[in-house]
Amino acid sequence: MFKARIKADSLKEFIGTVGSLVDEAKLNVSEDGIQIKAVDPSHVAMIETNLVKSAFDSFEAKAMEMGLDIDKFKNVLTVAGKEDMVELEKDDELNRLVVNIGNLTRAMPLL
């Protein structure tokens, strides 16, 4: 189970940092927030970053891992303004991340 709500600018910064190094990443979700550890394709650089629970407007999660195409996620986030709220929810049945930004809903398959 994963359901969260966060300001778009915070999420864009987090994903943008990761996206500067890798195209895909595994998100380690826990009750404390989201952590990403990733190594670039040439195995030269590594990134480890966290988005703590307090950064979210609301956050409910059980420990899990989600593989995500960072480039596609960044493209989805381009429609969000700085102050827009982004709602994220994992669809366990179809193994997708559902992203809601205002009236826009996008379901992204998880890797």
Tell me the role of every PLM-derived stretch.
Residues 1-19, 25-111:
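DNA polymerase sliding clamps and clamp-related checkpoint/processivity subunits
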